[in-house]
């Protein structure tokens, strides 16, 4: 299956007093990767295969986050090269889907590091009614190539 690779630059402000990226900032980095992967916009060099959702003002579909989970594996130090956030779909439901992520060291860096893995359940909502809307057959067909096993969290307790 296919994963979308989204390069995400760290900001100096992402660091906390322990000189690594703060856990809340990791969620913001994942949000940035999610927006670039799923919402239609300008061509920024990211595979647009997942980008089917119109996020412009007045769009007919809104998205709501129903659930998020992050497993932090290694501290992330500041670096100038963008991290490689790999995004795929772990599940396609009726009106929701699970976006999965691996937050990795910059492409080409050896040894490669896996800093975090995460998942987000996203619900598609009809903007006019405020009610969940079904994933269309066109969306389902386009997204099928990006579906693989969901994140296997190892530190549940």
PLM features: residue spans?
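Hot-dog-fold acyl-thioester-processing enzymes
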Residues: 1-65, 127-157
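Hydrophobic beta-strand-centered segment that forms part of the acyl-chain substrate-binding groove
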Residues: 37-97, 113-115
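Generic structural detector for well-ordered beta-strands
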Residues: 7-11, 71, 121
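HotDog/MaoC-like acyl-thioester-processing domains
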Residues: 1, 77-81, 88-157
């Amino acid at each position: 299956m296919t994963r979308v690779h989204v390069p995400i630059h760290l900001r100096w402000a992402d660091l906390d007093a322990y000189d690594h990226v703060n856990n809340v900032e990791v969620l913001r980095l994942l949000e940035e990767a999610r927006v670039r992967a799923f919402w239609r916009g300008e061509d920024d060099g990211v595979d647009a295969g997942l980008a089917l959702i119109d996020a412009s003002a007045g769009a007919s579909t809104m998205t709501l986050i129903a659930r998020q989970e992050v497993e932090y594996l290694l501290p992330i130090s500041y670096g100038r090269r963008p991290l490689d956030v790999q995004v795929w779909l772990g599940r396609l439901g009726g009106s929701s889907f699970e976006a999965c992520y691996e937050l990795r060291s910059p492409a080409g860096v050896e040894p490669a590091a896996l800093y975090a893995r995460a998942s987000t359940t996203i619900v598609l909502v009809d903007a006019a009614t405020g009610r969940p809307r079904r994933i269309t057959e066109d969306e389902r067909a386009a997204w099928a190539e990006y579906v693989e096993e969901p994140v296997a969290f190892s530190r549940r307790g």
